[in-house]
Amino acid sequence: MNKKLLFSLLLAGTAFTGHADEARLLRFPATNGSDIVFSYAGDLYKAPLNGGEAQKLTSHIGYEMFARFSPDGKSIAFTGQYDGNTEVYLIPTDGGEPQRLTYTATNSRDDLGDRMGPNNIVMTWTPDGKNIVYRNRISDGFDGKLWSISKNGGMSEVIPLPEGGFCSYSPDGKKLAYNRVMREFRNWKYYRGGMADDIWIYDPAAKKVENITNNIAQDIIPMWIGEEIYFISDRDRTMNIFVYNIRTKQTEKVTHYTDYDVKFPSSNGQIIVYEHGGYLYKLDPKTRKSEKISITLTSDNIYARKEMKRVADNLTAASLSPDGHRLVVTARGEVFDIPAEKGVTRDITRTPGANEREGEWSPNGKQIAYISDRTGETEIWLQSIEGGDPIQLTQNNDTYIRQLMWSPDSKKILYTDRKNRIVEVDIASKAKRTVMQNPEGEFYEVNYSPDSQWITYTKSGANNMSVIYVYHLTSGKEYPVTEKWYNSSSPVFSTDGKYLIFSSERDFNPIYSQTEWNHAYNRMGGVYMAMLANDTPSPLLPSDEMVSIEQQATDAVNKKTEATNNAVKIDPEGLPGRLIKLPLQAGNYDNFYSDGKKVWYASGRSTKVYDLAKQKEEIVAEGAYMDVAANHKKALFFKGNNLYICDFPCTKASLEENINLSDMVAPIDYSQEWAQIFDETWRAFRDGFYLENMHGADWNAIKEKYAVLVPHAKTRLDLNYIIGEMIAELACGHAYVNPGEIKGPERIPMGLLGAELSRDKGGFYRIDKILPGAIYSQKLRSPLTEPGIGVKEGDYITAIDGISTATVDNIYSLLAGKANVLTELSINRTASSKGARKVVIKPLDNEYPLYHYNWVQNNIKKAS
């Protein structure tokens, strides 16, 4: 029984959680001493601290997280996304309608799965229970600041620290233990660089800060209990709880886990609760002992239910049948056989737990080949167009297959893989052989010759320059087509077998900088043709009428010869010298096709054609790429998510009626799909990590460690978290998880004025500071400094779009959805609506460029 099957059985055995099953993947816990609140599947739940059945508190498409009980136990503050922005909300302890407290800038990077983490994370309450402290980022940058807002709402006040993160007040509320750097969401365990965090103590009265940990490891999330500050640290590799004594200044290790990290602990000042391996635990500081909290709950699993989905928006590849009447399309891991015009759309795989891709029709039209990982490894499968069960063509593959291609005679399939091999498979016998392997790197753009006897490809040499080769499959001999001094790419044989067409970077047209005495080379590529045989003339040679008549006679003889003998003739000696360059402007060229008379190619995101006889270039299709059917009579055009079929050859494609993709409906079983994504991610790192020793990690054991969590994933964010934890074990930077398909609320961008405001006693809002901008730059415009606006610091905003600002406790509640929208402000020199004048501005969606610009300008003043 293979590993994939074992994992599937494990998944099947835990897919349905009943009332008595213990819940797992419970996140971001907090306690009031009798209850525990946590996030599960994006919603908040509350359960007894000693364990038991959990009660659901929130239900929303957004993610509710980082709940914190108020000191009196009556309220819960949390971070939520109810109104299209990630903000601070408040609900009663037993649940109820959320009250929005904050109105802040809408960041594009504030998802739970992003390396920056969500914005406006609730950190704690002030000990008197009057205010809630949260961490805010004014933009997508690395810096966070601590802010405080009343539980009754109003305007937030900044805590006067340069930066701040997770924090905890001393019992008397006079000091604050805090972090400065935000790395809690990075997929990078065991980090020891300059951004490793420490625990600091801030004394507002003395205006002093003290570093109490000061070591190279991560020391994060302080919890102040009596004379001790608890925190988590990876100084002994696995993240555990440590404690620092304020009086003795000694640090002691409290928990001793060696498997999963302790994650996101919090405390009410008496008890600590935390995550470990997807479960919740409580720690008694008096005894230093931890106890698991067993929690059960019921959930409708709304984000993990099976469903049927239209998948046209998830299209990844498409190819024409030889006659152009049908297409094979891959989308969301399924392979579809669809009609070019009218007919039945068939999902020929229907495997929600596997990723099928790169579907290709055989040139003889009898079979469809595709790559699938249904066995736990990527293998090539065949599906007869007559129906029946799919046939597994390859067996026991040991790495990721990149791409496949049929031989023109439909007898073989060639594929490339992550071990930098070209492998050929015989369709009849299923025998496969390694054609070659390149120790310098992968092969690119492998293509067959028309007679199936040769292949061409690109590979890098020791100098990292890409060279094009041709290779004879029978003799095993390789011959260079280009020199090693120029990057060359995208080689294809012409269909008549006479030429090799490719791109090469040989145009050196330096662009000089206007501010520095430097230059750069851009748009170096050109279209080249190699005459494969010595006796093949250049298609660009001039000719007169007599020569043309003689050539026509020769061509007629050659056509008869080609009909009986389709062999491609290549004379290797002197081949790199038999190159011509088409008279085209230097640029970026690829996706070549040629019948020997014309050359089609992609340039500037459009398909173009060059007539060799007329020496003329024409645009075939604007903004579209082309793929030609095996019979060379139809072409498929890709434009955005739309597909079009046109007759071929053509010099002008008619892209009027796109192919109907709406009938592509696939069964989605999220539990199986997420298991596949987890498995493929693990294999991607196994096969592609830059060091074979995986930084010393036991990669097989790490997979087993985190695979047990996957069946408990109830949202895509759960899966992303598990994958992030797994790849973080490699202790390397820039290992990110793309969010994938996440269902969330519609974003409503906050309008910003490029100013700092405060509320007057009368209820109106005073402009305390206007951020100067640069009028000439759209990126640096400051709305209140536009010529003719006439707004000054000290002025009051008395109304926005006719609504009095005195009627709201936070002026930004009137600016929600106003980013880059014309907005009317009523401005007065006094805190009164009487005598106010009206101005129209366009609020910003991001103030960070203004803050950065002012920082730069201030530094210039200091230095000049």
Give residue spans per PLM region.
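A flexible loop/linker signature enriched in serine peptidases of the S9 family
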Residues: 21, 39-45, 60-64, 77-89, ...
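A short helix->beta-strand "capping" segment at the edge of beta-propeller domains
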Residues: 21-26, 52-54, 299-315, 568-585
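Blade-terminus and WD-like Trp-Asp/Gly-His loop motifs, strongest in beta-propeller folds
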Residues: 30-33, 67-75, 123-131, 167-175, ...
